[in-house]
Amino acid sequence: MGIIVNLDVMMAKRKISLTELANQVDLTQANLSILKNNKAKAIRFSTLESICEVLHCQPGDILEYVEDLSLIHI
């Protein structure tokens, strides 16, 4: 069981780069990359809110619950 982050999908849909998003949500590129690559252990609601605001999406567009992570290629 686990949560996967589909940030790269939303970024592609909105045609926004990692650098651009990092600047707009006031995160380092390194921290945003950790989140984008499913390496983050947690995310603050304030960060999630900022990302959703910039990408004009809902948290469910970025975060997805998966019962069996072994079936997902991350």
Regions found by a protein language model. Name each.
Residues 1-16:
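A short, Lys/Arg-rich alpha-helix, primarily the initiator
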Residues 8, 19, 49:
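Residues within the helices of the helix-turn-helix
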Residues 11, 22, 52:
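The alpha-helix within a helix-turn-helix
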Residues 16-34:
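Short alpha-helical DNA-recognition segment
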Residues 36, 66:
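DNA major-groove recognition helix of helix-turn-helix
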Residues 39-50:
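Short, basic-rich loop-to-helix N-cap that marks the start of a DNA-contacting helix
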Residues 72-74:
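Conserved small/polar residues in nucleotide/adenosyl-binding loops
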